[in-house]
Amino acid sequence: MNSNVLALAVLPNGDLVAGGNFTTAGGQVSAYIARYATPCPATVAITGAACASSGGANTYTARSLPWTGSTYRTRGTGLPSFAFVAVVNGFSATSIPLAAVLPPSPVGCAVLASPDVVDVAISNAGTVDAQLALPNTPSLAGIVLHQQLVALEVDGNLNFVQNTSTNALVATIGTF
C-alpha cells in the first residue's frame, strides 16, 4: 500500500478489508479500500449423525474458525446434564459403532473421529465448551482435524448409565 491504513475489518469468511489513504495495494489500483483473501481459508463442516441422550439431541458445533495463531473453539449441546465427555480429536474419519467400544450405547451411535488425541471434560447443564490453541505456524495450513464428543452419562451415584455421541466436525486449519 502506498499510504496509511486507517481501518481494518475481518469479514465472516476470514477475508481482511483495509481502508485508508492509499490508492494502490499489492501493486494494483485500489482507491482507499482493499480486500485480502487467503489462498488457504479455515473451514469447518458438520458430518455424520448424532444420537440422542437424556439431554436431548447431542450437537457439536464450531464457535470460531481454526486459523493459525488463534484459539479454535467448539461447543457441544444437548448432552446429558451430568456426564464425563471425551473430546475426541483425530486426523482421520472412522465409523465404529459406539456399542462395540463403550457399551451400553444406543443403536445408531458411532465413533466418527479417530481418537488420536482425547481430552476429558464434564458437561455443565448439558453443555461442553472445548478449545484448541493453534500456534502461528503456516505449516499447519491445510491440516484437517476430525472432532467429536462422546458422552459417558452417570447417575447420582456415579454409575455409568449410557454412552452417546455427537455429530462430527471436519475442520481445516487456515492461514494468511
Annotate the PLM regions:
Residues 39-176:
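Residue-level hotspots within well-ordered secondary structure
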